[in-house]
Regions:
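Conserved beta-strand-loop-alpha-helix hinge in the C-terminal portion
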Residues: 217-233
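ABC family nucleotide-binding domain
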Residues: 1-218
Length: 233
C-alpha cells in the first residue's frame, strides 16, 4: 500500500529552516496494522500528513497503491484522499444534529451516491464497529467511545485502502481507549490496512508493528512483541 523513499520535509520558520523529516524509508503492506509513534517534534504528524496526502515532501518519493503521489497537484491529491484514505481524528468531527447513520452517510452524499445505496453502505460500516443498534441516535445521545466508533464507520464507508488514525484515543479515558483499540484490532483482523499515529506506548503496543520516530528519522521499527519488550509493556 505505502512505500516512502528518502522522504524529507523542511519548513522555513521566519528564516530558520526546520527539518521535520530527514529521510524516511518506510514500507507498509496491504492488511498491516502499524502504529507510528514518537514524542512531540519527532516528525510523526508531518509524516502522517504526507501519508494522508494532506501535504507533500520537499524530497524523496511517496508511492500509494502504485501511484507516485509525492509530485501530484492539490486536485490530484484530493482525489486520492477521497478514494484511498479513511481518516479518524481524536476530535470526532460529527454533525451534532445528524444521526449516527447520517453522519456515516455524509462522504457518500458528497460523492453523489443514491440514497438507497448510501443507507446500505452506512449500515454496513456501522455494523463493522458494532454500532448498528445506535444508528438513529445523535452524537449527544452517545458515549465518547460510541462517537469515535461512528467516526471510524464514516472513515470506512468509502471502502478505503487505508484507515489513517491520528491520536484516535486522545480524548478518551483508558477503558474507552481499550474499547476503540479492540475495534481497530477487529478491523485489522478482517483485512483492513490500519495506520495509527500516537505518542502513547501502551496504545501503540496494540498494533502488530510499531515504527518509532525521533528527530525526523526512524529510530526503531519493531514487531508488537519486540516493542512491548523494549518498553516493558
Amino acid at each position: 500500500v505505502i512505500v516512502t523513499r528518502g522522504i524529507k520535509r523542511e519548513y522555513d520558520m521566519g528564516g530558520e529552516i526546520v527539518r521535520a523529516l530527514r529521510g524516511i524509508d518506510l514500507a507498509i503492506a496491504r492488511n498491516e496494522y502499524v502504529a507510528i509513534m514518537g514524542p512531540s517534534g519527532s516528525g510523526k504528524s508531518t509524516l502522517m500528513n504526507i501519508i494522508g496526502c494532506l501535504d507533500t515532501p520537499n524530497g524523496g518519493e511517496y508511492w500509494l497503491n502504485g501511484q507516485m503521489v509525492s509530485t501530484m497537484s492539490d486536485d490530484q491529491l484530493a482525489r486520492v484522499r477521497n478514494k484511498e484514505i479513511g481518516f479518524v481524528f481524536q476530535t470526532f468531527n460529527l454533525l451534532p444534529r445528524a444521526t449516527a447513520l447520517h453522519n456515516v452517510e455524509l462522504p457518500l452524499v458528497y460523492a453523489g451516491m443514491g440514497s438507497d445505496e448510501r443507507r446500505r453502505r452506512a449500515k454496513e460500516a456501522l455494523a463493522k464497529v458494532q454500532l448498528e443498534d445506535r444508528m438513529d441516535h445523535r452524537p449527544n445521545e452517545l458515549s465518547g467511545g460510541q462517537r469515535q466508533r461512528v467516526a471510524i464507520a464514516r472513515a470506512l464507508v468509502n471502502n478505503p485502502s487505508m484507515l489513517l488514525a491520528d491520536e484516535p484515543t486522545g480524548n478518551l479515558d483508558s477503558a474507552t481507549s481499550e474499547e476503540i483499540m479492540k475495534v481497530f484490532e477487529n478491523l485489522a483482523g478482517s483485512g483492513q490496512t490500519v495506520v495509527m499515529v500516537t505518542h502513547e506506548p501502551d496504545i501503540a503496543a496494540h498494533a502488530r508493528r510499531v515504527v518509532v520516530l525521533r528527530d525526523g528519522l526512524i529510530s526503531t521499527d519493531d514487531s508488537r512483541e519486540a516493542f512491548a519488550a523494549r518498553h516493558g509493556l
